[in-house]
């Protein structure tokens, strides 16, 4: 940023003994203060600077480099250079148009699955890149459907997100009230005035009488020291008992919606009205979609079986570091990395490039998006697929 460059100029002012390595075409951190003019104006600040262009690329095929060059040459604010390679010409870049984000994600997942099943690639050969973290939801769903192991770099896998774990904890208690971990997780979520002291006393009572935690809560009136908390605890257990009764006459989707409505979980998030809270609501909507799809695709759907399936796919989050898996990440997170096969998803106006960049009066905003696209394209070594939804 400007302050850092001013500091460097002061440090180097006497002896001019300074070496700088950078690529203006990969300057993608304007949003956190990086200033591309530090590179573009470098020779003006250091008159005797010797410039060495490193234009040979050892990573990508000629086809991929040609595409990257075609994109970045549209930028005016850059040092003139053209990447070249002694690598093979390589495969053509695939361009895929989908009806919507889910069809796009389905194409990505099915392509990966087919290539791995036929021995043409390993899961670790693939990276899925996107502009914003929110785009990972549809991709995760389709990868999970095909049992494709994956990791999100710089983000959380779907079933590790707080709101998803909270809702699933309610469902686990309804299915099996002996699940002490689930009970402890949501006894005060959303906040209902049941504190850690109350939980500790209930656990002590449970140990003393051979109960599980939920059974102990049902006996709250008999637990010494919990007289004041008894009403709040009783409201919680009444809520759970009501859900257990309704489970018999409701579909799973109806049950989930009942839990969300009666607990006020979504209402509390909606009241926050922040981007983070709205993102959590969208994740919960995604969970409801998964529940609906499970019911539609299962002959005799049950809460217990659904939770078993969730437990199985959640194991993907605990992958061994040496195992083979697909990586998902934003383009910003991918800078400096390389992968044999790259899917660049969501390449439609308003998403990538972003709406604000398109509408901005500052041409530098769109040039930043173009640099980001250049970074994305040049992550691919062998094959690149660019996709977008109508």
Tell me the role of every PLM-derived stretch:
Residues 1-41, 56-60, 259:
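Conserved helicase NTPase motor core
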Residues 4-7, 11, 67-68, 112, ...:
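Structural preference for long, well-ordered alpha-helical segments in enzyme cores
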Residues 14-17, 23-25, 46-51, 88-93, ...:
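Short glycine-/polar-rich loops that comprise or flank the Walker A/P-loop
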Residues 22-25, 32-36, 56-58, 68-69, ...:
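A short beta-strand-to-loop transition that corresponds to the Sensor-1 phosphate-sensing loop
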Residues 25-30, 59-60, 152-175, 187:
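Short alpha-helix plus adjacent loop in nuclease-associated cores
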Residues 27-30, 60-66, 73-74, 80-81, ...:
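Switch/connector loops and helix/strand junctions flanking conserved nucleotide-binding motifs
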Residues 47-50, 56-149, 172-176, 230, ...:
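Helicase P-loop NTPase motor core
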Residues 136-148, 161, 168-390:
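Conserved helicase C-terminal RecA-like lobe
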């Amino acid at each position: 940023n400007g302050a850092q460059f001013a500091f460097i100029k002061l440090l180097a002012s006497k002896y001019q003994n300074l070496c700088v390595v950078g690529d203006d075409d990969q300057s993608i951190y304007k949003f956190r203060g990086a200033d591309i003019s530090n590179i573009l104006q470098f020779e003006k600040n250091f008159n005797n600077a010797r410039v060495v262009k490193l234009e040979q690329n050892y990573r990508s095929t000629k086809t991929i480099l040609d595409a990257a060059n075609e994109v970045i040459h549209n930028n005016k604010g850059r040092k003139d250079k053209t990447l070249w390679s002694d690598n093979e010409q390589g495969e053509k870049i695939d361009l895929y148009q989908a009806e919507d984000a889910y069809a796009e994600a389905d194409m990505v997942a099915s392509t990966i699955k087919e290539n791995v099943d036929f021995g043409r690639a390993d899961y670790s050969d693939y990276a899925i890149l996107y502009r914003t973290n929110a785009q990972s939801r549809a991709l995760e769903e389709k990868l999970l459907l095909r049992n494709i192991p994956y990791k999100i770099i710089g983000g959380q896998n779907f079933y590790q997100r707080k709101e998803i774990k909270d809702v699933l904890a309610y469902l686990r208690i309804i299915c099996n009230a002996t699940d002490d971990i689930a009970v402890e997780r949501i006894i005060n979520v959303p906040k209902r005035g049941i504190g850690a002291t109350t939980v500790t006393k209930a656990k002590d009572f449970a140990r003393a009488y051979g109960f599980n935690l939920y059974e102990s809560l049902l006996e709250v009136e008999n637990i010494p020291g919990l007289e004041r908390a008894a009403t709040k605890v009783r409201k919680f257990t009444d809520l759970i008992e009501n859900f257990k009764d309704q489970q018999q006459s409701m579909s799973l989707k109806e049950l989930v919606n009942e839990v969300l409505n009666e607990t006020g979980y979504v209402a509390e998030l909606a009241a926050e009205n922040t981007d983070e809270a709205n993102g959590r609501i969208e994740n919960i909507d995604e969970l409801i979609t998964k529940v609906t799809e499970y019911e539609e695709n299962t002959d005799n759907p049950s809460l217990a079986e659904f939770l078993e399936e969730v437990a199985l796919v959640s194991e993907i989050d605990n992958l061994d570091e040496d195992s083979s898996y697909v990586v998902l990440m934003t383009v910003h997170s991918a800078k400096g990395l390389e992968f044999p096969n790259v899917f660049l998803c969501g390449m439609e106006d308003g998403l990538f490039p972003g709406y604000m960049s398109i509408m901005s009066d500052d041409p530098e905003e769109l040039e930043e998006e173009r640099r980001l696209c250049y970074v994305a394209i040049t992550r691919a070594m062998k094959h690149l697929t660019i996709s977008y939804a109508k």
